[in-house]
Amino acid sequence: MKINDFFAYIEEQVADCAKKERALIAENRKDEANMERIKSNVYGIAKSLCQVTEELAKKHGLDHATMFVDKLTAVMAPWKASLTAAKEHTDSEKECIELIKLETADRILEAWKR
């Protein structure tokens, strides 16, 4: 995916999450609204990582695509560890949060690779 298309995808997803969040709040569904906010935050993290890795790749003559995937994967590692801990401690709320973060990051990686 071209970088401008990727940024457009991210912005579209953030806007969609915000729209869903507002609708859920209006329906007094706060927990579900919080999940949309979490997704939006992950998209924001990915956008920031993409911008930073693009600059670093240019500066150091490295492959931007590989660098972005590596950095996003590194960000996901603590989420995976937290998910494992949540499962071990039967913390269903934390488990749900970590799953949403990881699923969103996986969607981002899939979009990036298109």
Regions found by a protein language model. Give the residues of each.
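Intrinsic disorder/low-complexity detector
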Residues: M1, L49-D70
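Amphipathic alpha-helical binding modules
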Residues: V75-R114
